């Protein structure tokens, strides 16, 4: 594995163990050139998934992009990062077990929304605001009412 610090082509594995949920192998590595230490995760990939965007463009499924988008939704919320990791692992397993090689981005988006709804209401609304492309505050109000998350108040924003 290439060193992320100096770019040296080789690194030594110093420690290897299963991750908390057992879905990955966590490896501590050290670069023999610069002495830099870093962590890598090794995961099983059952099949190559292609995501079909709304525009029709196709791109390989990127687990890290999913983690980042969920991370943005849960940022500064009292959500344990391990719960987020388990949630993402569950979504990836569901996607892989569908048996399809190409999936619409809407499938991923709906899975994330469903998982976030049970994890944290604020993260759910944050994600929905981007996924459903809210343009103004009335979009938020309508969504909150439809989802039963509104307190019923008609306050000016």
UniProtKB/Swiss-Prot annotation:
Q: Which cofactor does it need?
A: Zn(2+)
Q: Name one GO biological process term.
A: negative regulation of DNA-templated transcription
Q: What Pfam families does the annotation carry?
A: ATP-cone, Zn_ribbon_NrdR
Q: Which domain of life is it from?
A: Bacteria
- Give every ATP-cone domain span: 49-139
Give the unnamed zinc finger regions.
Answer: 3-34
| Alphabetical list of InterPro entries matching this protein | ATP-cone_dom, NrdR-like_N, RNR_NrdR-like
What are the entry keywords?
ATP-binding, DNA-binding, Metal-binding, Nucleotide-binding, Repressor, Transcription, Transcription regulation, Zinc, Zinc-finger
Q: Which one of the record's GO molecular function terms can you name?
A: zinc ion binding
Q: How is the cofactor bound?
A: Binds 1 zinc ion.
- Indicate yes or no for the key word rRNA processing: no
Task of the protein: Negatively regulates transcription of bacterial ribonucleotide reductase nrd genes and operons by binding to NrdR-boxes.
Family that this chain belongs to: Belongs to the NrdR family.
Provide the protein name. Answer: Transcriptional repressor NrdR
The gene name on file is nrdR
